[in-house]
Amino acid sequence: MITVYSKPLCHYCTMAKQWLEQNGFAYEEIRVDTNPEARQFLINEGHRTMPQLYHKGKLLVEGGGQALVRLDPKHVKELIGEVDVGDIQL
């Protein structure tokens, strides 16, 4: 599952979550305004902007929501290890 670190009233956060939903990706949203541990984690990782997208503790894509929506959903599936059988060519 993808973890989306977000904050309220963030256009890019909304855009990223909509893209994930439209392309069938499950995600967990963690709001940094109500979760000080998450906010500190992102600061320690060097992030100052939202959203930040992680999968299994690793940054999924540099550039947050803007970068995510430019990716092909198949590429994101490869990044998180969710390759459909129909996508595999023998």
Regions found by a protein language model. Name each.
Residues 37-41:
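Short acidic active-site motifs
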Residues 45-54:
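Structural micro-motif
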Residues 1, 89-90:
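Short intrinsically disordered terminal tails
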Residues 55-89:
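Non-catalytic, surface beta->alpha helical segment in thiol-disulfide oxidoreductase systems
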Residues 1-25:
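Local sequence-structure signature of Cys/Sec-based thiol-disulfide redox active-site neighborhoods
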